[in-house]
Amino acid sequence: MKIAVVVQRYGQAINGGAELHARYIAEHLARHAEVEVLTTCATDYVTWRNELPSGVDEINGVPVRRFRVKRERDPRVFGRRSDRVFERSHSLGDELHWLDAEGPTSPSLIDHLTTQGDRYDYCLFFSYRYYHAYHGVRATAARAILVPTAERDAAIGLTMFQPIFRGVRALMYNSHEERTMIQAVSGNIEVPNVVVGIGSDVPQNPQPARFRRKYEISGPFAVYVGRLDKNKGCPELFEFFQGYLHDPSGSLTLVLIGDSILPVPAHPRIRHLGFLDDTDKFDAMAAADLLIMPSYFESLSMVALEAWALGRPVLANGKCDVLKGQSIRSNAGLYYETYAEFREALRAIEHNQWLSTALGRNGRQFFREHYSWPVIERKYLDMFARLSGEPAGARMDPLPGWLERRRQNLPAAEEVLAALPKGPSPGERRNSAVTAVTETRADSVPTPSPGTAARRESRPRPGSSSRHRTPHGRGYGRSRGSGGPAR
């Protein structure tokens, strides 16, 4: 069996969520099949500049075939086209122009799939919203399997993607929330699918003391791992944690790991360490009292899964359906929607060792049952086996003609997004052991039930916060309003 893994960027130094996801899957499937990666020569997801040579390379034993990007992204053109399709009624032609402006525009990659696609038994396309996936799926519909990596942002409301979701052979979803959202927007419930997610190569014996010595960190701390970016919720994290610092009973330091495009508050209990290699990152997570995930947009939080694999509790932004759903299903995390909830959840994990330990124990079990590599690999292999026994009927709707593409009859994508169902979706079995005990246990610190918000007073309706938009579809939380603290 020969598998093509098709993704916008690829390489050991490329740590974007979907790109790392694609590399992990390619390397693990290579143990069971012949795998070739098809990608571009770009390394920068903003410009798509050609920085690597075209042709065939090899990374960790997997052949990688690179194709040139025809032109770099023009941010002004992309911004104008985004405003048009996201905020106003528009045409299918407008959406296709938006896709072309977003990139990475690589006709040579699509030509390869069109002429050589029958060399592969299946083509795995990562990230639905990019040029390579949209046109590549259309070129190889009879063997196309889509890993959407979709977030709850406006791009999901574009009409052009609905035939893609309905026309592939199968979909491998990252989360139950992602599946619910895509099925609601496209009506593709009959397409074979499974919630898979992604595993991680978490070390068996990380060295927390080594991290503390190397970076001279003593005392309890919370860790954030990922890009320090507005779209990751970091401004709100900074605001909320600075409010927590006024609490005389709190002693946590906030340790930030990842490259930053934001100014980091200057405070002795806020430490920005920059980008760390995996050894230091996992040592840091093992040393931390908890991981904080403040992002509004995720299709899957890889870093939360890694924290759970290491037995660390997670405090997550409850305005992100995926993070909220993961916390509920795992019973290994708390979530917040306001500063009051953030503060009380942080206090609970900091001061209640029993709660922290129980959350971490549940996290280990959740990761082992649903995200260990044997589980992930088996889900892919089972899907390949299922599809091999079914006819590959052509279900892809053809593109309309030139005149139909010009009709200004499509709704603003933001309006479509607003109408989609919200909230966490049911999924894997929930471990209720912690909840059953915490509801009857009295401690000096308020103890929220795991998988629930810390406090309920003045709680807004989920999804009622001010709108946030991510322009690049970064959806993983990995090494990728009102209710603020009183001043």
Question: Which residues are covered by each model-predicted region?
Answer:
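Conserved donor-binding/catalytic core segment of Leloir-type glycosyltransferases
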Residues: 215-232, 238-242
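Aromatic "clamp/platform" in nucleotide-sugar-dependent glycosyltransferases that forms part
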Residues: 296
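Short hydrophobic beta-strand element within catalytic cores of glycosyltransferases
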Residues: 313-317
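Donor nucleotide-sugar binding/catalytic pocket of nucleotide-sugar-dependent glycosyltransferases
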Residues: 143-154, 161-207, 217
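N-terminal subdomain of nucleotide-sugar transferases
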Residues: 1-68, 118, 244, 403-428, ...
